[in-house]
A protein has these predicted regions:
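Conserved HGGG/HGGXW glycine-rich cap/lid loop of the alpha/beta-hydrolase fold
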Residues: 13-65
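Active-site loop/oxyanion-hole signature of alpha/beta-hydrolase fold enzymes
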Residues: 40, 54-94, 98, 136
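Alpha/beta-hydrolase fold catalytic core
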Residues: 1-26, 47-50, 83, 87-89, ...
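Active-site loop signature of alpha/beta-hydrolase-fold enzymes
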Residues: 34-35, 60-63, 125, 254, ...
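Conserved serine/cysteine hydrolase catalytic core
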Residues: 193-274
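Catalytic histidine-centered segment of alpha/beta-hydrolase-like enzymes
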Residues: 285-294
Length: 326
């Protein structure tokens, strides 16, 4: 597989993306803090059937940082403009987490550009304000991100996470934090300004560390104060006309912190009520499903592509939605 990294200026903002394969267009949008490389386990097989574009969202990876200008609608408009300027044909859009919300926004607001949507464990309804602040553990996690980054080693040494069935938060294991922190500092000293890529780490941890080392923390800051949350989730889901698959990963509720995960069953049921032809797949997998279950993920994309073949595009309505500023 020949994979090329390229840059494109989208609405005045430079975006990095990777491109491979030939066939119907397929765009991959990673979740918050993750670079396009998070799709490396599925890219080779997808590129056998599709012309694949894996995009670094603004503020992520090698894409330009735009502090003070992070909203779901801006990121959604970035994707629409990328589809128009770079892809040049209607595409299947697959997004993980916040990337799933971005793909849904694009499908709702530019129906002529999106053939189908695979929303991989997006925070549907839980990433609306004030629910994100009041009913999700991830808001506490985001506050920790803002307080500790760019001290990447310090981030892990003070990280605490909830565990299903336990009230008390579990600290990141100190011996692991010590070893990881030392490796991060050595890498930063040897390669100042470069992504922190520690190859002996498990792949998901390695990508998380790398992503955070390139990440504009202001993207997360916008999630702590609600300025990110300008998307009406119900309205967007209801306006998606193309085929859509929603993957729900594992989640649970903590008695004091609320939802731990992207969606609960009530959120999924609400999405299904808004879009009756929605295909829902519930997987007992962690949040980044394409890393945890790459073969099953590719199969889900291929099944969605079959449904997309039979979909007749509806042209954009005459009243276009307002464009988000760059």
């Amino acid at each position: 597989m020949e994979l090329l990294e390229k840059d494109a200026v989208i609405d005045g903002v430079r975006h990095r993306y990777a491109e491979a394969g030939a066939g119907p267009a397929l765009v991959l949008v990673p979740g918050q803090s993750m670079p396009w490389q998070s799709y490396q386990r599925v890219l080779p097989r997808l590129a056998q059937r599709f012309h694949v574009y894996a995009l670094d969202v603004r503020g992520h990876g090698k894409s330009e940082h735009t502090p003070g200008r992070y909203t779901f609608s801006r990121c959604g408009q970035d994707l629409v403009s990328f589809l128009t300027q770079v892809v040049g044909q209607p595409a299947i859009c697959c997004g993980n987490s916040s990337g799933g919300l971005i793909a849904i926004w694009a499908a709702a607001n530019a129906p002529e550009r999106v053939r189908a949507v695979l929303a991989e464990d997006p925070p549907l309804f839980s990433a609306e304000w004030p629910r994100m602040r009041d009913d999700t553990w991830v808001h506490s996690f985001f506050v920790h991100v803002v307080k500790t980054l760019p001290d990447l080693a310090g981030f892990f040494s003070t990280l605490q996470v909830p565990s299903d069935g336990k009230v008390k938060l579990m600290p990141f294991p100190k011996p692991v934090a010590w070893v990881l922190g030392g490796a991060i500092r050595r890498r930063q000293k040897k390669h100042p300004g470069a992504p922190v890529d520690i190859r002996w780490l498990p792949l998901q941890v390695r990508l998380f560390v790398r992503g955070l080392s390139e990440y504009d923390v202001d993207f997360t800051r916008a999630c702590t104060d609600g300025s990110m949350c300008d998307m009406d989730h119900a309205d967007c889901v209801a306006r998606v006309r193309c085929p859509m698959t929603l993957i729900q990963a594992s989640s649970f509720r903590h008695e004091s912190l609320g939802l731990v995960g992207a969606m609960d069953d009530a959120d999924v049921a609400r999405a299904k009520a808004l879009k009756p032809d929605l295909v829902v797949e519930k997987w007992a997998k962690p949040h980044v499903v394409h890393l945890a279950a790459p073969k099953a993920y590719v199969a889900a994309v291929e099944a969605l592509a079959v449904r997309a073949r039979d979909f007749t595009h509806v042209p954009r309505p005459s009243a276009e939605p307002g464009r988000a500023g760059a």
